[in-house]
Amino acid sequence: MLDPKFLRNELEVTAERLATRGFILDVERLGKLEEKRKSLQVSTEELQASRNAISKSIGQAKAKGEDVAPIMAKVGTLGAELDAKKVELAALLDELNAIAMSVPNLPDESAPIGADESENVEIRRWGTPKEFNFEVKDHVELGETLGGLDFKNAVKLTGSRFIIMKGQIARMHRALAQFMLDLHTTEHGYTEAYVPLLVNEDSLLGTGQLPKFGEDLFHTKPATEEGQGLSLIPTAEVPLTNIARDSIIDEDDLPVMMTAHTPCFRSEAGSYGRDTRGLIRQHQFDKVELVQLVKPEDSMQALEELTGHAETVLQKLGLPYRTVVLCTGDMGFGAAKTFDIEVWLPAQDTFREISSCSNMQDFQSRRMQARFKAKSAKKPSLLHTLNGSGLAVGRTLVAVLENYQNEDGSITVPEVLRGYMGGLEKIG
């Protein structure tokens, strides 16, 4: 959520910056609503002051023995007018808040301006794609031949975009998640967290999934003691970041760095017909998430470091990748700046996204009222929040299967995973 004062005072500037990400801010409508708000605010305050002044005169009139009935009638009339104005003002503020909640974050000035993913900027590459002397198979053919990926029975149990993993491939999937968690907690300084997979509406509003992306969520019917429905998490970013909601963190406790391995659930409402084959785009998938809460002046450096933490996973697995900075037109709703990490998939002969690392600045923290208190400050300030995949486990499995395949259809186990797989060197 943008700073309401900035939005009001810098409406044209805000509209120009939002236009670079393809969002058209209705400046005329907002301007009219803001003028109406100011007018209502003034008239409400004037009515309140008049009512208070006349109410005080009742006691004085009684002391003089005067008839207070006309004064009481006037107070009643003013009270009714005031109540009506308050209702009108509240409705207008709700309308303005609804607009504010639907406006995406302002792109950081360092984000390249562009319309779509074709204008993203590659900033580095690591590793060299292997040249195979045989025809490469994709992960679906490899996994099904080895008996480790069962799409047919997953469809029978649930539907499309689900998977059953078995045997050593299921074990490798688990090993990848354990390896990622161990790396981030022992070498990168993150604290592991176990979090709920179901969250309430306030949490989804806090991190920006609601109100705009409700159709991409799986919702439950009202079933809690509080009587509200819950939603399955689309990413562990939601519960991890919301831990700081309605909190004030001491400056000495920053940065807060958390990681969690969870299943994630997405309806993929806007992805009909895309990546229908294999594990690339599933309704349920595992991910190791990285979240940081930092002081504003530290957030851009923290983004570089968080992205590096995700890249280290691929480096240790020996998987070639490239890192791109997203242009303004391709960034997510709440991001001020984003780096995407794309891993090489031989069967597709291209790089595919495996991690997205974003600096949200104070966009989420303003929604959540997540703040910190500096020693020298009289009042708390909004935190900056960052998140990234460290990594998507299923897509990492895809990359390992395809990059480590052998001509006979077997898979060489990357050295860093062998300790998690009982010393196993090859699958198949």
From Swiss-Prot:
It is an enzyme of class 6 (ligase). Pathway: Aminoacyl-tRNA biosynthesis; selenocysteinyl-tRNA(Sec) biosynthesis; L-seryl-tRNA(Sec) from L-serine and tRNA(Sec): step 1/1. Its EC number is 6.1.1.11. It catalyses: tRNA(Ser) + L-serine + ATP = L-seryl-tRNA(Ser) + AMP + diphosphate + H(+); tRNA(Sec) + L-serine + ATP = L-seryl-tRNA(Sec) + AMP + diphosphate + H(+). Its main location: cytoplasm. ATP binds at residues 266-268, 353-356. GO terms for molecular function: ATP binding; serine-tRNA ligase activity. One of its GO terms (cellular component) is cytoplasm. Keywords: Aminoacyl-tRNA synthetase, ATP-binding, Cytoplasm, Ligase, Nucleotide-binding, Protein biosynthesis. L-serine binds at residues 235-237, 289, 389. It is found in: Cytoplasm. One of its GO terms (biological process) is seryl-tRNA aminoacylation. PANTHER family: SERINE--TRNA LIGASE, SERYL-TRNA SYNTHETASE. Homodimer. The tRNA molecule binds across the dimer. Consists of two distinct domains, a catalytic core and a N-terminal extension that is involved in tRNA binding. Belongs to the class-II aminoacyl-tRNA synthetase family. Type-1 seryl-tRNA synthetase subfamily. Catalyzes the attachment of serine to tRNA(Ser). Is also able to aminoacylate tRNA(Sec) with serine, to form the misacylated tRNA L-seryl-tRNA(Sec), which will be further converted into selenocysteinyl-tRNA(Sec). This is Serine--tRNA ligase. It comes from Shewanella piezotolerans (strain WP3 / JCM 13877). The lineage of its organism: Bacteria, Pseudomonadati, Pseudomonadota, Gammaproteobacteria, Alteromonadales. The gene is serS.
